[in-house]
Every structure is written in C-alpha cells, then in structure tokens.
Amino acid sequence: MKGKMSHLDKFLENRMLSAPKSVPSIQNIASEFISSPDHLSAYDFRQPFSTILVGQVQSGKTGHYLGIAAAVADKEPRFPIFLLLTQNSVSLQQQTLKESIKLLTTFDVFDESSQVEFELSLSSSSSPKMVVLKKNKTPLRKWLRILNQDLLSGRPLFIIDDEADSTGLNTRVNVPDQSDINEILEELISTTNAYFLQVTATPQAIFLQNKVSVFRPKSHLQFKPGTGYLGGNFFFPESTMPYSYKQTDNNELNLLRNPISNELPIGLKKAIFTFCITAFYKLKIDNDTECNFLIHPSVRQIDHQLILTKIQFF
C-alpha cells in the first residue's frame, strides 16, 4: 500500500500501545497465514476453505486473529467484508466489538444492529468492513439475508469464528439432525464460498468433523503463549498436587443447603478470606480496577440463591 500505512502496520502500532509483548507473535502468525502455501494461498475463491488457529486459554487469540484480518485486507482486496462471530453473549460480543474498533482503525467496524450504517458505508467508504455478531439465530439470519450475492457481487466473505468449538458445531448430530446455529453458519459459509478461520484453545471436536464438512479445517496454525503466561500447566501440574486446589469436606454442600442455618462451612470461609486478601493486594498494590470471585457450589439454581443469601449475611 503506497502512500499510507498498511492495515497490518496500523493494527500493530495500535496493539503496541496496549500489549507490546504480543506484537512479534502476531506479526509472525499474520505473515505465515498470508505467505504459507497451506492457508490463504491454498484458497481458490470458488469453494469454502477452513483454517483453524489454536492458542492457549487467555493467551491473546483475539489480537492474533485481528492481526490476520488486517494482513488479509492488505494482501487480498477480494475480501471486502469480514464477519467476526463471538459466543452467544451480549457482553462478550460488545467487548470484542470495542476491541476491534480500537485496534482496526483502518477498517469500518459495525455492530450487529448497524445494518443501515453498514449499507451506507459500502458506497461512501473504500475501507474493508467488519461486522461483529453473536452466534445467535436472530442476528445470524438477519445478516445471512443482508449478505446476499447481489450485495457481494460474487465476492466471498472472510469469516472468523471465535471459540469455534462453542455453539457453531452441530450439537444434534447423534439425533440425527442439524442444530439451528450450525445450519445457518453452514449456509453462510457455503453460499458465499467463504474463507472460514476457526479460533479455539480446544480444537478436538473441530478436528473430528466429517471430512467433507465445511467445518473440518484443511490447514492449521498455532502460536505459543507469551512470556509470563500462566496456564493450565502452571495451575494444575501433573507431577504434584496443584497449590490452587484445596479439597473440602464432602458434607460442605449439605451444610450450605441447610435452610435453617446461616453458618458457612470452613472451606468456603477460607475461600472468601483468601479472595479478600488477594483482592486487597490487587486493588491497592497492583492498582487493578477489579477483582472477581466465582462461587459455583451446585448445579441447582435454588441452591445458588440460598447460598448467596448466606454469603451476604456472612
């Protein structure tokens, strides 16, 4: 791109402000994706093609797939529109939307509700477009109608599926039947001959898809977590008992379910005290803005409400 900064260079400049240590890895993955014969170069634009990007849990997958999108926009102008699919959660979809707007400043980025703005931008701006959607039937069907062949003029979509093993795969394959989300995604991919980039930390179910399925990846990429990453091997080592795992008495849940007593069992008390000390340190010493604690003592919602009341009383 002559005369102005490339999409990838601008993305990396923005990324440098918030996560500078991730930039070399993103650069390497983006370069491999567009230069290797196994990925973008293997796609013929006449039929769907799928690649899977694998990274550890909470290791920076969002930055890596957005970097790939920027590199693709530089390399291949035949992708005018990118779809970014998130889990079926408003908060996650909005978080991903904000991150995309912040980092992809050379793109026009749209919320799933911004159909009018999206359509206006097609004639008013030459920038690549990205639409961020939840994997939910309503927005997916809506954008399946919008992104028809008349609008695309025969050009394919570039679809990024974040947490690709969640929701999008066929959850009714043993019935046998096809789940709604899987059916919509399959139609979206097939009718637009899309390039489908699946992103996950747990690829097992994706690799087990039928060989002729559009969800079965034809190539794969993997990146290592950066310096300082603390993942499953740290918290749950195979050689020793994890320090983060503390076993409690078997009867603690029964005590928590007792409706006539507000007393908390010793295991939960210790967990709460540990959280309070940790939160104080993180907020006052490390200057973090928040610190959260998840308590999931039962699969029954009625238990959750009773136990919440006891904890609040405590």
Predicted segments, located by residue:
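Conserved pre-motif I regulatory segment
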Residues: 11-54
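Conserved Walker A/P-loop ATP-binding site and its immediately adjacent core
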Residues: 62-64, 78-105, 135-136, 201, ...
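Walker A/P-loop
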Residues: 47-67
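Conserved RecA-like ASCE ATPase "motif II neighborhood" in helicase/translocase motors
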Residues: 114-163, 167-188
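Conserved C-terminal RecA-like helicase domain
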Residues: 97-99, 103-116, 151, 155-164, ...
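Flexible loop/turn segments at secondary-structure boundaries
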Residues: 59-63, 90-94, 138-140, 166-169, ...
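Conserved P-loop NTPase catalytic core
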Residues: 155-161, 165, 172-288, 292-301
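Pre-Walker A (Motif I) flank of P-loop NTPase domains
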Residues: 46-53, 80-81, 127-129, 289-293
